[in-house]
Amino acid sequence: MVERIAPVLVFLIAVTVIAELADNAKVFDVAAREAAHLAQGKVWRLWLLVVALATGLTIVLSLDTCAVLLTPVVLAMARQLDIPPKLFAFTTVWLAGTASLLLPVSNLTNLLALHQFHRLDSNYLAVSWRPAIAAILITVAVLAVLFHRDLRRKYVVPPTPHVDDKVLFWGSAGVCVLLGPAFVSGIDVAWPAAAGALVLVGLFAVRRPAALRWSLVPAKLVVTVVALFVAVGFLTAHGLEDLLRFIAGTDQQLRLSATAALGANLVDNLPAYLAMEPVADADAHRMVALLIGVNCGCLLTLWGSLATLLWRDRCDTARVDISWWSFLWRGMILTPLVVAGSVLALNG
């Protein structure tokens, strides 16, 4: 278990440090404000740019970066521009889930699944790209329909935020950009993530040492991941695998995805993935079907993923009220469409 979980934890810690320091350098603030300038006062244009930004951040820096760091930026921007904030709130949380299929680094569940892809001698991206694109397009279409009135609005273009330290800003932005090609190069993702984190820590140690604190390390999340590994391993050894194999079946990918989605919404997507991995590890397509369920299908309940819980906390801080019911009814529209559409694309 140690050989499998150690690279995952190294990546998790490194990418969190990178995202937090990039946020401190105002990379995300500037990106959001530049989007507002490029959109030239049209909300629909601004929304499409936020969609692109949320998708890119999720794919390269993981769903937590989108849900936790981009959300407060776009919510504050929405309030300043007098745009209803729920449009951007749901854009970030939904794309944090549905845009997290493409690369192994996009979601912790994908990183865990990478072990099985190596065992099966299969290329992750070769199997994931079609359902990943389908999931993003379906999400964008549903958002456009649900928030069509807000998308017709206009706003006054805001000033670009002041950057205190351009060396930190460009250094952080450069690391974020370079991580993209590094993550798809075939190198173990823990290495470029660790290198990027070390570069930024060194840069901040020289120019802004006060930003370096132990709270940058996601200690609680690391402990949670280790505890879940141990707990699910124990339950699997005592009959859980047989029960899930009966429920999910052995041949229908949509049934597997639906079972995974149900489990994610009941108990969180990480334990749902860990519990169901032995049911899906026969081939690469079943593994991606499982990931579709736990990544894209976890958007019915506020506890469906850790990223959603953190996103809700950011919404509360920004005084954007998201009740469990408002999240559920919108999720009931998106989830069946995105899960079914992604499974169809997987087999296309």
Language model: regions and residue ranges:
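Membrane-embedded alpha-helical segments and adjacent helix-loop junctions characteristic
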Residues: 1-83, 214-283
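Alpha-helical transmembrane segments and, especially, the helix-loop junctions at the ends
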Residues: 58-68, 85-119, 140, 267-274, ...
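Alpha-helical transmembrane segments
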Residues: 4-16, 123-141, 286-300
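Interfacial loop-to-helix junctions that mark the boundaries of transmembrane helices
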Residues: 1-8, 121-131, 161-165, 181-194, ...
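Juxtamembrane and boundary regions of transmembrane helices in multi-pass small-molecule transporters
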Residues: 83, 122-166, 303-348
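Membrane-interface alpha-helices at helix entry/exit sites of multi-pass transporters
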Residues: 41-49, 79-92, 119-130, 283-295, ...
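Flexible interhelical linker loops that connect adjacent transmembrane helices
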Residues: 33, 146-173, 207-217
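Hydrophobic mid-bilayer segments of alpha-helices in multi-pass membrane transport proteins
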Residues: 5-17, 168-178, 187-204, 217-230
